[in-house]
C-alpha cells in the first residue's frame, strides 16, 4: 500500500496540518496543473530534512483538512546528470529488492515547459495498490538551469490513486 511509504515522516493521507500551521499553508505560493485547478502543489517547509533537500506536497483545492494526495522528496545533484542517474538507479534497485514482484515502467520524456527541448526526465514508475511511486532523474537543460536556477535532482514521488488518475486523465488535457 502506497500509504506505508514516507517522505521525511509524511505519508499519503496525512493532514499537512500535523506538520505545519494553517497560516503557513495558506500563505504558500500554489502551483496548479495546466488544465485543472482541482489539485495544487506547494513546497513543505519543515524545520529540517533528514534525507531530502526539498519536499513538495499535493493537496486538493477544496479540502480544508489539507489531506496529502501526493508527496515528493528531491535530492539536488547540482547539475551533475551522471550522479542523478546513478542515484536514481540505486533507489530503483532498492525498491525492486523490497518488492521483487512489483510491476514497473521505465521511460524518458522531454519536459514541455522547457521550449528549448533540452530538459528531460528519466523515470521509473512502480504501480502499488492505491497509488504509484515514481523515481525521477530530472536533467534540466543548460538554458533552464541558468534562467530559472533549476538544479538536476533525483526525486521520489508518491501519489495516491486519486491523484494518479487525475494526473493521467485531467491535469494535462
Predicted segments with their positions:
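Non-cytosolic coordination micro-motifs
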Residues: 1-40, 70-173
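Compositionally biased P/S/T/G-rich terminal and signal peptide-adjacent segments
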Residues: 42-67
